[in-house]
Swiss-Prot record:
<keyword id="KW-0847">Vitamin C</keyword>
<dbReference type="GO" id="GO:0031418">
    <property type="term" value="F:L-ascorbic acid binding"/>
</dbReference>
<dbReference type="InterPro" id="IPR005123">
    <property type="entry name" value="Oxoglu/Fe-dep_dioxygenase_dom"/>
</dbReference>
<dbReference type="InterPro" id="IPR006620">
    <property type="entry name" value="Pro_4_hyd_alph"/>
</dbReference>
<protein>
    <recommendedName>
        <fullName>PKHD-type hydroxylase AM1_3707</fullName>
        <ecNumber>1.14.11.-</ecNumber>
    </recommendedName>
</protein>
<feature type="binding site">
    <location>
        <position position="96"/>
    </location>
    <ligand>
        <name>Fe cation</name>
    </ligand>
</feature>
<feature type="domain" description="Fe2OG dioxygenase">
    <location>
        <begin position="78"/>
        <end position="172"/>
    </location>
</feature>
<keyword id="KW-0560">Oxidoreductase</keyword>
<dbReference type="InterPro" id="IPR023550">
    <property type="entry name" value="PKHD_hydroxylase"/>
</dbReference>
<dbReference type="Pfam" id="PF13640">
    <property type="entry name" value="2OG-FeII_Oxy_3"/>
</dbReference>
<feature type="binding site">
    <location>
        <position position="98"/>
    </location>
    <ligand>
        <name>Fe cation</name>
    </ligand>
</feature>
<feature type="binding site">
    <location>
        <position position="153"/>
    </location>
    <ligand>
        <name>Fe cation</name>
    </ligand>
</feature>
<dbReference type="GO" id="GO:0006879">
    <property type="term" value="P:intracellular iron ion homeostasis"/>
</dbReference>
<keyword id="KW-0408">Iron</keyword>
<dbReference type="InterPro" id="IPR041097">
    <property type="entry name" value="PKHD_C"/>
</dbReference>
<dbReference type="GO" id="GO:0016706">
    <property type="term" value="F:2-oxoglutarate-dependent dioxygenase activity"/>
</dbReference>
<keyword id="KW-0223">Dioxygenase</keyword>
Length: 219
């Protein structure tokens, strides 16, 4: 399941982050890539020892966790290994799959949070390979895309301007993507039913199934 999430960050939060990152120290992105991904990774990222790093990471985590769609669809146990990546002209990240574990946590869901407008750069699309083909994304500033960490994906070459994003990984309470999607569908259905008809016996049955499946699958 690929999920686009609008307005994760407010305009004020975006402006503050971009101001901080504009003067921050960026280093070669290969330093955090796996041994095979280093061959195709060409970007820069906020230095891990940068004074602003911890604060910015906490801001992103808080913004995601307050968003109801993120919580319902992803079922996050923890958000980990956050990076702030910058792609300037000529930079890209070729086909790769994310590591199964990062920082001692399992990577179930990957996300990209866009920090500047798509008009600020050309190229730089995020491409995710699924069974039905390649899906391409270039979202508005403040919006995020979440997708299974098990997929092959890439960032196309930036041909002009600068692409600025926050990327990170989530260990979910429910590791299986199909189970997460089923839980999300049930939750969406019961909320729609409740909005239309209130707390009915049918609503209670769907809620029972949702709760019991989550109880069975959650880790």
């Amino acid at each position: 399941m690929i999920l686009t999430i609008d307005e994760v960050l407010t305009a004020e939060e975006l402006a503050e982050m971009k101001d901080v990152l504009a003067t921050a120290d960026f280093v070669d992105g290969k330093t955090t890539a796996g041994w095979h991904a280093k061959l195709v990774k060409n970007n820069t990222q906020l230095a891990g020892k940068a004074a602003c790093s911890m604060d910015l990471k906490e801001r992103v985590k808080s913004a995601l966790l307050r968003h109801p769609l993120f919580k319902v669809a992803i079922q996050p146990r923890s958000i980990h290994t956050l990076l702030f990546s910058r792609y300037q002209e000529g930079m890209s990240y070729g086909d790769h799959v994310d590591n199964a574990f990062m920082g001692g946590a399992r990577s179930d869901v990957s996300f990209t949070l866009f920090l500047n407008a798509p008009e600020d750069y050309t190229g730089g699309e995020l491409c995710v390979e699924l069974a039905d083909g390649v899906h391409t994304y270039k979202l508005a500033a403040g919006s995020a895309i979440a997708y299974p960490s098990s997929t092959i994906h890439r960032v196309e070459t930036v041909t002009s301007g600068t692409r600025l994003v926050a990327v990170g990984w989530v260990q979910s309470l429910v590791r299986d993507v199909q189970q997460r999607e089923l839980l999300f569908d049930l939750d969406t259905a019961r909320r729609s039913l409740f909005a239309t008809h209130g707390k009915t016996p049918e609503f209670d049955l769907i809620s029972k199934s949702h709760a019991n499946l989550l109880r069975q699958w959650a880790e």
